[in-house]
Amino acid sequence: MRADWIAKRRGQANVSQMHYARDGVVTEEMAFVAARERLEPELVRAEVARGRMVIPANVRHPELEPLAIGIEACCKINANIGNSAVTSNIDEELAKLRVCLKYGADTVMDLSTGGDIPQIREAILRASPIPVGTVPIYECLAHVKDVADLTPELMLEIIEAQAAQGVDYMTIHAGVLRDFIPLAAHRITGIVSRGGALMAQWMLANKAENPFFTHFEQICEIFKRYDVTFSLGDGLRPGCLADASDAAQFAELKALGDLTRKAWEHGVQVMVEGPGHVPLDQIPMNMEKERELCSEAPFYVLGPLVTDIAPGYDHITSAIGAAVAAQHGAAMLCYVTPAEHLGLPDIDDVREGIVAYKIAAHAADVARHRPGARDRDDALSRARYAFDWNKQFELSLDPDTARAKHDETLPHEAFKSAEFCSMCGPKFCSMKIHGHLAEAAAAQDEAANGAAAKPAGGLQVLP
């Protein structure tokens, strides 16, 4: 779809959406997302120029159907896929991608850490019509025996290679600085971000500052050539409730705000990653803090989990926090699966995580009165009241599961037009009872109106 759009920009030094927006240009991508979001194209352009909206759309990813992430857009969700050093393969990752697309993930991140990482990423990119993100530090580690052996040159080389391949956004842990490491020393769970821990290890081993920070402007130069969006990593995010909203987290967040504005000077798009594990009552404050420190750049949050006691159910503990975060301004939610803290997610875990987060994002869109956000809810409610079971399944976030649940007790097709379910049966269905009451009331009203319009029997009206 984007091949012709991209061809017109070939040879330009900066092809980022922010660059064009600041020049007053409404790109084809901006017009496309405006239609998707029911927004005016000029509003999209202004939001991208301001930095409050991003359109991750690498010019080397022509398969992409552009989308917007920002406070004026519907809340988006990301699903993580990718192998580990001990399990998974290309076919399995592509199967996960198909599940992501089926159930409505807005973006995917390839977090592969083993095998032929570029080959896996290439397969995902060519099959993905949604933005693809990565964490470059993972591939960097595949080229060295020890994290201490990483060089800035290698890191920039890997970033350039991923950009040239078509990656739309990258998590860059540039805000984990040497001075911040001691701030996390007394945490219960320490540094829980893989990228954050790796950069801390590198800095301690090399007695030097974070190379993502010292070489940030070189990364900006790469990103603007391909239109890669920064996803500034929260390497010091809290990994448990006790560590939430501490000095380490907010020191890094302030640094990410400075880096956001630095990237904007280069015309590069930015979103900022956020926690993590946060008590429910602290979530609004965390959202406000990001807006304040990061000049309203889109906030991309992992959950947050609102309790630490439910391994196996962290798609639920985090979706609760995600809904609150989105209601208070988070622009994109990174899903959490039932396998979180326990192992590598399988396809079923991916599906459950996506559905949980689609619910959270949708609930926030309804609460924020997004244009058309409640249309599907109202349509399903009407189908429910009309006992149109097939329409209810069709409108569900997960039609297969909705139908399967109905089939468990009423499997025959005849029951798909029945005016009851197995919970209440035909005698106790409140909607059926109300339907009869409504019909009776309507009949009474009609009779009353007819009687009022008709002269009383036996009386003659004299001229």
Swiss-Prot record:
EC main class here is lyase
Q: Which UniProt keywords apply?
A: 4Fe-4S, Iron, Iron-sulfur, Lyase, Metal-binding, S-adenosyl-L-methionine, Thiamine biosynthesis, Zinc
Which terms in the GO cellular component ontology are assigned? Answer: cytosol
Binding-site residues for Zn(2+), renumbered to this chain: 277, 341
Which prosthetic group or cofactor does it need?
[4Fe-4S] cluster
Listed GO biological process terms: thiamine biosynthetic process; thiamine diphosphate biosynthetic process
Spell out the reaction equation it catalyses.
5-amino-1-(5-phospho-beta-D-ribosyl)imidazole + S-adenosyl-L-methionine = 4-amino-2-methyl-5-(phosphooxymethyl)pyrimidine + CO + 5'-deoxyadenosine + formate + L-methionine + 3 H(+)
**Co-factor note (free text):** Binds 1 [4Fe-4S] cluster per subunit. The cluster is coordinated with 3 cysteines and an exchangeable S-adenosyl-L-methionine.
Any one GO molecular-function label of the UniProt entry = zinc ion binding
The record, for InterPro entries, names: ThiC, ThiC/Bza_core_dom, ThiC/BzaA/B
Q: Name one Pfam family in it.
A: ThiC_Rad_SAM
* NCBIfam families linked: PRK09284.1 (NF006763), PRK13352.1 (NF009895), thiC (TIGR00190)
Q: What is its EC number?
A: 4.1.99.17
Residues bound to substrate: 80, 109, 138, 173, 193-195, 234-237, 273, 300
Protein's name in the database: Phosphomethylpyrimidine synthase
**UniProt function note:** Catalyzes the synthesis of the hydroxymethylpyrimidine phosphate (HMP-P) moiety of thiamine from aminoimidazole ribotide (AIR) in a radical S-adenosyl-L-methionine (SAM)-dependent reaction.
The annotated subunit structure for this chain is: Homodimer.
Cite the binding residues for [4Fe-4S] cluster.
421, 424, 429
* Pathway(s) annotated for this protein in UniProt: Cofactor biosynthesis; thiamine diphosphate biosynthesis
The family assignment reads: Belongs to the ThiC family.
